[in-house]
Amino acid sequence: MNFELISEYQPTGDQPEAIAQLTEGVLEGVPAQTLLGVTGSGKTFTIANVIKNINKPTLILSHNKTLAAQLYGEFKSFFPNNAVEYYVSYYDYYQPEAYLPSSDTYIEKDLAINEEIDKLRLAATSALLSGRKDVVVVSSVSCIYGMGNPSDFYNNVIEIKKGKLLDRNVFLRRLVDSLYVRNDIELNRGNFRVKGDTVDIYLAYSDNLLRVMFWDDEIDAIDEIDPVSGIRLATFDEYKIYPANLFMTTKESQLRAIHQIEDDLTKEVAKFEEEGKMYEAKRLYERVTYDMEMIRELGHCSGIENYSRYFDGRNAGTRPYCLLDFFPDDFLIVIDESHVSVPQIRAMYGGDRARKTNLVEYGFRMESAFDNRPLKFEEFKELAKQVIYVSATPADYELVESEGIIVEQVIRPTGLLDPVIEVRPSLNQIDDLMEEIQQRIEKEERVLVTTLTKRMAEELTEYLLRNDIRCNYIHSDVDTLERVKIMDELRQGVYDVLVGVNLLREGLDLPEVSLVAILDADKEGFLRSHRSLTQTAGRAARNINGKVIMYADRMTDSMKKTIDETNRRREKQLAYNEEHGITPKQIQRARNAALLGNNSNEAAGTTQGSKAYIEPSSNTMAADPIVQYMTKPQMEKTIERTRKLMQEAAKKLEFIEAAQYRDELLKLEDMMKERWG
């Protein structure tokens, strides 16, 4: 099936040329291209058109789980008839295993898995292995982390066909081999039940049941059933049932792995003893021996991922399988906000290695733990045959990799221009800022102020409040949901000024903001680099009166570069508007959607743009960005699941945990009422 792009808008401004250039580059096999698109120019809409033109499976890689959810919503609206999938970390909470030698502290792994995201991850891998070409997977950096062998996953796919001879008990054994669990009492995701000649399977990657009816040893009917109402939704002549887990293995592989682990354990224990590390040798022997007993008896153990090399049949030092292995050879990778995403991909391996070094050196884990890891950057590059880097401020790496193939997109469909930038002395900067704020308040516009430190942000906020200016601050110490609430209240007019540090850069979409003030703009460093200044200035680009004031006592190279580039873009935008008779239009957006979703309109760059994305720190389902894209039945199931968890916690007398689930339940019910009444 081919990609079918659904949108009431047509490419305008720089978009047609950008689409043509990028499409031509991909079809000609160009390994790397860069889309340099300013804020609000409709970069997502451009990429959607490129995907439609090339008709290849595509991975959209984002550096942030919340932005990934936003992009997922956008591409879902562009391609409603194609497979648009979502693949991010499925942990609501994750505390990795670690050892701190300085204090002799061992920290056990602790986690909570989000069932809804686990389902979406399985749906993504199932779509990729189905053989269809029209697949878009929106992913965070989780796509470079180790997972099961795609061959093992595919070998456990169960193909059934109406009229085919198949012994029912053989079918049930195959379901168990695919890690489905029989439960005739309560059917949950990943379970199946048997009633006579009818087998109901709650698919691990779907919201619906698959009902397989037998007549003797022949498959009589294959139906998709609504799990709540029992209504038949669809009938199939043939169907592929994908496994219930991404990590597949066989009994033979398991026994072989245990034998190899025990052989290597003997060698590693002997090595510790030779070095005189008797305590470490004893610890390693006891821990691994216990793990092997658990695997023999139960089929799993805590930390089994540290033995993944043995189960996969990989040699020491070889890279793990990851999501990229599930794609065909000719797929495309689009790296969004590449100036942030690429360094993140590069850093993942080093951080993982540093943590595990202590675990291995002190006998908590075998050396095989090193092979349960994210990809090294060089390994990622080998798998990424064709890449489009997308950023308003691409880094030197992307520019070098693209070898000069830079596709520029600076014209906004709204006709809005890049903001005017002024440089003012830092002497009396707060008094000057106060005057500017008062002017914006009179016009009912908003102001963003960026400082260098959290303390400066808090102190400036206190000063402004003492002077009767309604303001608040956001930085990394402010809770995720509270940050979202504060920024939405800024749009609603509860505050006139928002003060922040580094959260006012990529992706913050506040059309009411007409002034961005950058304090200490001449303090060269990460927060005042050319790219940071350009991204920060871009927050004023969605208002027709957009203006940026840099307070500084000298002109740094970063400031000069930012100002020169902004002026160049303004001239090009002005010339285009004059040539085509375009009058800039102020963006109007529904305030309650400021930070909670997206649609094709804004992606096309017509009236809106990308939204704030802030990594969720709460471990509640209500805080997860994917909730906003749930259908009504999905939301009902999530509410019911949360209610069960609350009741189970109460039965165990875990009242604090029960209260947390109760609060989450109330939030989900409120969201349900807001959306569907």
Predicted regions and their residues:
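Walker A/P-loop
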Residues: 28-50
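Conserved strand-helix element at the start of the C-terminal RecA-like helicase core
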Residues: 57-69, 86, 277-280, 440-462
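Pre-Walker A (Motif I) flank of P-loop NTPase domains
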Residues: 27-34, 56-57, 133-135, 445-446
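Short amphipathic alpha-helical segment within the helicase RecA-like ATPase core
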Residues: 69-77, 97-99, 459-463
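Conserved pre-motif I regulatory segment
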Residues: 1-36
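Conserved helicase ATPase core of P-loop NTP-dependent helicases/translocases
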Residues: 478-500
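Conserved RecA-like helicase motor-core motifs
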Residues: 80-89, 303, 446-448, 460-482
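N-terminal cationic and glycine-rich segments that engage phosphates or anionic surfaces
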Residues: 87-432, 436-442, 461, 495, ...
